[in-house]
């Protein structure tokens, strides 16, 4: 899974 907040 991936967190949108973690995307830079």
From Swiss-Prot:
Recorded superkingdom: Eukaryota
Task of the protein: Promotes expansion of husk leaf blades.
Protein name: Husk leaf blades expansion-promoting protein
